[in-house]
A protein has these predicted regions:
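A short, mixed-charge helix-start or loop-turn motif at secondary-structure junctions
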Residues: 1, 67-69, 189, 193
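Conserved catalytic core of two-component sensor histidine kinases
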Residues: 76, 148, 226
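EAL-family c-di-GMP phosphodiesterase catalytic domain
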Residues: 38, 55, 104-111, 130-145, ...
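Glycine-rich, phosphate-binding/catalytic loops in enzymes
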Residues: 67, 117-120, 149-152, 178-180, ...
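Bacterial c-di-GMP phosphodiesterase EAL domain
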Residues: 3-126, 136-139, 152-153, 166-168, ...
Length: 279
């Protein structure tokens, strides 16, 4: 057991050292998962997701290296790189789509985050209203007062704030009331359970009604099956994200999603045509 623990510790240290070098050597890259209108398939924006291609290990799973980065100061360097690269690439798109970037708890309580984002927006010439910062409930409650201060400063810049993984943290309703949020993202764990668990379905319905009452847009995360999409459409959801609507793609492939001056996902085009033919 001790030997196994020692092996894991050495592996963690190796990954941390390699990640530090990866930032400097340009081994990180971004992929973008579309967020789309459920009824039309029109893409409204993309979420930036960081990937790491190690020269020896190959593709390192985000679930492996991101937690290690979050446990060290490396998440600040990784986070800054992601913000700058996402804004730089989004500024080159031919349509003014939203770009969503996740911010960790460590970044959120960093007193310099708002200034960093302001500097990056000026550097990349990306309009502030196109940048959406995603924060989790866990990040918000790690240091509520500093998180609130940072979010208020971002709001002054014109940046949109979204609560990610809604329902998985603590005191969700109080967080919605106390923090300056512009959007709610329902966690995948609720979406995948809507048909097998009546409670999950009830929670998803309740969140939509809550957001409607507060005037907050809501987006369903992790939609992977036609049944899940059908449920969301039936319940009045308008926006979703997930592999059924589109897998993450590199920046070079975003242009191919443009179709007759309206951005439609390839899988959605087929569905829309099929539904139209059936009517």
């Amino acid at each position: 057991l001790i030997r196994r623990w020692g092996d894991k510790l050495r592996e963690r240290r190796t990954i941390e050292q390699d990640l530090r070098q990866a930032i400097q050597e340009g081994e990180l890259h971004l992929v973008y998962q579309p967020q789309a209108k459920i009824h039309t398939g029109e893409v409204t924006g993309f979420e930036a997701l960081v990937r790491w291609k190690h020269p020896i290990r190959g593709d390192v799973p985000p679930g492996l290296f991101i937690p290690i980065a979050e446990e060290s100061s490396l998440i600040l360097a990784v986070g800054e790189w992601v913000l700058r690269e996402a804004c730089r690439e989004a500024a080159t798109w031919t349509r003014p789509l939203t770009i969503a970037v996740n911010v960790s708890a460590r970044q959120l309580i960093d007193t310099g985050l708002a200034e960093l984002i302001q500097s990056i927006l000026a550097e990349t010439q990306l309009s502030p209203e196109r940048l959406e910062i995603e924060v989790t409930e866990t990040a918000l409650i790690s240091d509520p007062s500093r998180a609130l201060e940072t979010l208020n400063r971002l709001k002054v810049l014109g940046v949109t704030i979204a609560m990610d993984d809604f329902g998985t943290g603590y005191s969700s309703l109080s967080n919605v009331r106390e923090f300056p949020l512009d959007k709610i993202k329902i966690d995948r764990s609720f979406i995948k359970a809507v048909h097998a668990n009546k409670q999950a379905a009830a929670i998803v319905r309740a969140v939509r009604l809550l957001c409607d009452g507060l005037g907050l847009p809501v987006i369903a995360e992790g939609v992977e099956t036609p049944d899940e999409l059908h449920f969301l459409r039936k319940e009045g959801f308008t926006d979703a994200q997930g592999y059924l609507l589109g897998a993450p793609v590199p920046a070079s492939e975003i242009a191919r999603l443009v179709f007759n001056n309206v951005i439609l996902l390839p899988s959605t085009r087929v569905r829309i045509v099929s539904e139209a033919a059936a009517q």
